[in-house]
């Protein structure tokens, strides 16, 4: 018998890939298959709730770097996925299944706009401020 395994499933790495991907997906106000970037924004409310539960649930197992880099992990994953959608569009939609012409191009635009939204919130200090406040509350047993 032969078994195919996706290397993402077994490769060593940081939890930041999974956290970034989860937040990229759930905190984006647009769906991945939206037809316009007008609906794209990044919900800091969802971000705060997710990160609070994540840090609290990890019970001190995260390194300082893993906590500090949560905002950047979202940006990295959104950029990576945006580029992958764009490359697949250019290559003729061979990797990601599509239902209509141009769908992967639209998906790329959504992810790259999301990356831009996240970058703005990182640059302004908003996301890191939220993370620091959550960490302070967790350390003080306030959440």
Region locations from a protein language model:
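Active-site acidic catalytic loop and adjacent metal/ATP-binding pocket
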Residues: 1-17
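All-alpha amphipathic helical-bundle segments outside canonical DNA-binding/catalytic cores
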Residues: 62-74
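ATP/Mg2+ or Mg2+-diphosphate-binding catalytic cores
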Residues: 80-143
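Active-site capping/gating regions of soluble enzymes
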Residues: 5, 46, 70
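Transmembrane helix-bundle signature of multi-pass membrane transporters/permeases
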Residues: 11, 73-77
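Active-site activation/catalytic loop segments of kinase-like enzymes and analogous catalytic loops
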Residues: 16-60, 76-95
């Amino acid at each position: 018998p032969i078994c195919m395994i996706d290397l993402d499933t077994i490769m060593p790495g940081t939890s930041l890939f999974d956290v970034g991907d989860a937040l990229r997906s759930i905190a984006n106000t647009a769906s991945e298959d939206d037809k316009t970037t007008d609906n794209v924004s990044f919900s800091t409310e969802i971000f705060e709730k997710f990160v609070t539960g994540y840090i609290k649930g990890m019970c001190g197992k995260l390194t300082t770097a893993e906590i500090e880099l949560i905002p950047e992990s979202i940006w990295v994953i959104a950029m990576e996925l945006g580029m992958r959608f764009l490359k697949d569009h250019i290559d003729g939609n061979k990797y990601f299944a599509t239902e209509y012409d141009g769908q992967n191009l639209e998906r790329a635009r959504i992810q790259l706009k999301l990356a831009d939204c996240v970058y703005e919130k990182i640059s302004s200090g908003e996301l890191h401020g939220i993370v620091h406040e959550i960490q302070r509350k967790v350390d003080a047993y306030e959440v």
